[in-house]
């Protein structure tokens, strides 16, 4: 195996060397072609001379001989002519001491050989030109010099190591005069050897000189000449004959080939030896690794078996302990269940007795109500007929009025033009008079202001003294009241803290969720206020147009299924278009929330049924973007504290205006002073708060009511939640994304928390809106019906129920009483008229 591998490696190396040699030959051929093309472009002034030969000579009429030169033949061989007497041969002596010294040295050298300057042919005058006529010879020499100024280069050959190639040879004449004599033995030739690196620099400079201007060419040529002259002085000069130069080149090439073959053989041997060593080392290493692997595998198997036995023992002990605990817990739970069943039976018996009493009283009231209903229906029919007649009359009157108004408008326009001219003249006159009066009034005002300032200072001093006395008295009274309230609150199920009264029910989480939502909502508003100043014009225009579309869509929501589907698709599209940046998405969601809450004051307070289509649109959009529901609840809790629920209590040294502001009363200014009063009355405030609560109840009802999502991809994954309150719940019918604060459990928690608080003037209004919207759903649902019944029983208790009957709330209290009586008779509350639209 070792022998075959070494043979293969040697063969591959030989093939690589052969390929490299072929590549070098191809490169040399390409260089030859490039050099030929470059020199032909220079108008054939420079001829590329490789080792060349002389062709058959021709005789001219004047007795001269023309000799043509061809490539691949030495220019230094015999010159033949037709004159037999004048033919000469140059005897070359190879026994020259200079050649031996030249071969021993590795330094740079210079061989001078005279060259005949000519084009494609050279004219020699053999035996005719007299030696004494020197003037004619000089004239001919000058003419030839003018035509043949440029140098001729030899074709490239393979470079031997340490020796320059013939590509870098340039041939020049040794002397100024090119007189051709009969004897060629005394001729000398200049062969200048250039380094290959210098030749490349010259070629690169020539390519750059064609692109640059003439001025730069002249400067570079002068610099190159100076450098060449300096380097040529340092080189050694040797005088050689033509045959000796060829002999040197051939000999150097042979030595180069011998050296290369030796190096290749040595490297092949080294590679074979290394290959054998590496192979033996790898085999030994593989054997060691296998032994180690088997030993480790056996150890691991033993450890695993031991650990498995220990785990089985521990698990059996834990099972026994768990069984004992389970049996003890079962016995305790059975005893508790028996006690609860007894208590439930006692409560059911009490309620049945109360129901029988109510049924007898309600039967008589039903008869009276039926009579009233029949009378009321007759009146309605009569009123409808009257309204139809009035509408027809009004239409006719409108048409007549419109015609009259058009005539009057034309007359008024003409009058207005006249009056406008008269007014302009009067205004000019009045302005002049007013300016004079104003100057007089300013003087009088300045005097009055000085007097008033003095009086105000005296009044302020008196008021400050009175306020200090009143504050001290109020503080003492508040401390006494707080002590009494804290004692009473501990007996009841609520607590007072930081001007807020909220429930102490441990199962309720509404107040904690309210705090978390308010924090996250404040963070979003800060983010929008910070980024608002950094927006570009395009972003501002997009936000403005998007808010317009949202306002139009929410204003056009009506109680029809087509309108609801259309508006939900528009709102979803507006959020999808704003997903370019986080700022735009949050701003669109906030604009939807603001506009939907503004509908409470404009529509829902006067017409509660309009809350259901709006709630359905918001729930459908919230299924795809749950962060909208979270923002809606946070802003709704800020507007109306009773949706949490909690009551507002006075703080220390707090004015009545700030208390009413925290309760939710509307003021003319955002910043409230101590003496400011709310714009609305107490009845208007109660109606507006009930509008917010009706929207909250409608959101719960529509989130629990089954419906088909209007969006094209309801099952697709929604966007990332801003607050993290959204949870995906799988129903039996379909999977939909529901917020955990909009379901039956949250509504029962709200009702428990409100019952645990001490009733106020507004509590009867809150119960009425809650039962009219959600009473039917909670009473019919199997899971919530029993718990709902228990909570209603707590409301009916005398201590709680009678406290709601306060002066000014008789209407809402009687309405609540009627609703509860109907519930105990029928077992359900009536459904709201606007639910099924």
UniProtKB/Swiss-Prot annotation:
Residues 213-234 have a biased composition (Basic and acidic residues). It comes from the Eukaryota. InterPro entries: GLE1, GLE1-like_sf. GO terms for molecular function: inositol hexakisphosphate binding; phospholipid binding; translation initiation factor binding. Pfam families: GLE1. One of its GO terms (cellular component) is spindle pole. Residues 171-188 have a biased composition (Acidic residues). Belongs to the GLE1 family. PANTHER family: GLE-1-RELATED, MRNA EXPORT FACTOR GLE1. Required for the export of mRNAs containing poly(A) tails from the nucleus into the cytoplasm. May be involved in the terminal step of the mRNA transport through the nuclear pore complex (NPC). This is mRNA export factor GLE1. It comes from Dictyostelium discoideum. The gene is gle1.
